[in-house]
Design a protein with these regions (language model features):
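Cell-envelope/extracellular polymer assembly enzymes that use nucleotide-activated donors
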Residues: 28-31, 59, 217
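Donor-binding/catalytic cores of nucleotide-activated saccharide
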Residues: 95, 116-232, 237-255
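Membrane-interface aromatic/basic loop that binds lipid-linked glycans or pyrophosphate carriers
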Residues: 7-10, 299-404
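Glycine-rich, basic loop-to-helix element that forms the pyrophosphate-binding segment
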Residues: 90-106
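Short beta-strand/loop segment that forms part of the nucleotide-sugar
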Residues: 57-66, 86-91, 115-116
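A conserved acidic beta->alpha catalytic loop
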Residues: 49, 64-73
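Short aromatic/hydrophobic "clamp" motif used to bind/position activated sugar donors
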Residues: 111
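N-proximal low-complexity "stem/linker" segments adjacent to membrane-targeting elements
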Residues: 1-51
Length: 404
């Protein structure tokens, strides 16, 4: 084809190449990605608090995941009124894939993945972005609280066990803390800002096949490769939570996915040569999370979850390649050891037998204690009666006996 027909000669730079050279590498400071699925009850609150950010140089990419309510209509109305808003309408592809779509489209120097039913402090992006730039961070997390939707109250979020490695805004990484890095922050993605180039270079994406804890996988992958991680302690995200029954139903439906999440994390670590350096951190992270989830699962699903681990996943996760002292908590070690030794039915029989034995011991101990208490009372009563008899005996003596 003649170059003259294209409007430039062979010696000249193509217009699109010239535009690429003159355009900034990152047109936005931050890309905000929000996957949306049937969130019309709270979507406006999320959108309004994002668009009211004090840092204004951001793009908001909303990925509607085939909503059947008014979510898409709400998103389109915001896009009409604010040029920073982009709406991507998808079929029901799942939250992980929806986030990946937003990640592919992102043009911000940093990226954050928020939830469509949460709400945010106006300084969220400004504080995280400035902190990331000042400290040259790959990942920065913020403090958050939980908003109990039904009771309309805020609950302080629990501190992570090894969150102190970021005390006073310290910068940490897997190099300084290989035994703790995966437990140093939550597995939530919605309270973290990531450097986009870092995510792209390391090819970190959400696993589309995961229905729960897809953000845990993403966060673990990022923490395992990041050179500079920190956090701010301001509460900038308000995460909406619902009643316990809602959570129980979620675990009941998808509990079989939990070991798969951690196995995928292990596979990622192995591909990148990070499993051996972070093996102790991965052990305690995966075992303690599985133990916690086991305790949250409804009683009628505990056996499935237990036997899933017993029949291969616990071994695949590497739990039995460690010594007792590698486990940070005895109850987590007991959980992992019992899974390796027993099926759920066998474990339950032993547990109930142990409870019965403890009950018998407690009953016998209580009986002995009660007997001792009664005996002590009887001795006190005897001494009192004896003393009382002596006192009254003096007054009952005849006058002449008293004179003598």
């Amino acid at each position: 084809m003649n170059n003259e027909n294209l409007g430039y000669t062979a010696d000249e730079i193509k217009p699109e190449e010239q535009a690429e050279q003159t355009a900034p590498k990152w047109p936005y400071k931050v890309s905000v990605v929000i996957p949306v699925y049937n969130a019309d009850d709270y979507l406006r609150s999320a959108m309004d608090t994002v668009l009211a950010q004090t840092l204004t140089e951001f793009e908001l990419i909303c990925v509607d995941d085939g909503s059947t309510d008014k979510s898409l209509e709400i998103l389109e109305s915001y896009a009409e009124n604010d040029q920073r808003v982009t709406v991507m309408a998808m079929s029901h592809i799942g939250i992980g894939t929806a986030r990946n779509k937003g990640l592919l489209k992102a043009k911000g120097e940093y990226i954050i993945f928020l939830d469509a039913d949460d709400f945010y402090e106006p300084t969220l992006l400004e504080v995280l972005y400035n902190t990331a730039k000042e400290k040259n961070l790959d990942v920065v997390a913020t403090g958050f609280d939980l908003y109990e939707n039904k009771k309309e109250r805020f609950i302080k979020s629990p501190e992570e066990e090894h969150g102190n490695i970021y005390a006073d805004g310290a910068v940490a990484s897997k190099n300084e803390y290989p035994d703790f890095i995966l437990q140093s922050t939550t597995g939530y993605v919605w309270n973290k800002l990531f450097r986009t180039a870092f995510i792209q270079e390391k090819e970190i994406v959400f696993a589309p096949e995961l229905y729960v804890f897809e953000d845990v996988y993403f966060v673990c992958c990022a923490l395992s490769l990041a050179d500079r991680v920190s956090r701010v302690y301001e509460t900038l995200v308000h995460h909406r939570i619902y009643h316990q029954q809602h959570r129980a139903r979620l675990f009941k439906k998808h509990s079989n996915q939990v070991p798969i999440v951690y196995l995928k994390v292990k596979e990622f670590l192995m591909r990148h040569g990070m499993y051996i350096p972070l093996s102790k951190s991965f052990l305690n992270f995966s075992a303690s999370r599985c133990y916690k989830i086991f305790n949250l699962i409804p009683a009628d699903k505990k056996d499935d979850f237990w036997d899933l681990l017993h029949n291969g996943y616990a071994d695949s996760l590497g739990w039995y390649r460690h010594e007792v002292h590698d486990f940070e908590h005895h109850d987590v070690y007991d959980f992992a050891a019992n899974i390796g030794l027993y099926t759920f039915d066998e474990y339950e029989r032993l547990r109930l037998k142990g409870k019965l034995k403890n009950l018998k011991t407690m009953t016998l101990d209580a009986l002995k204690k009660k007997i001792k208490q009664l005996q002590a009372k009887a001795r006190v009563r005897e001494r009192w009666n004896s003393l009382k008899g002596k006192i009254f005996g003096v007054f009952k003596k005849k006058p002449e006996q008293a004179e003598k």
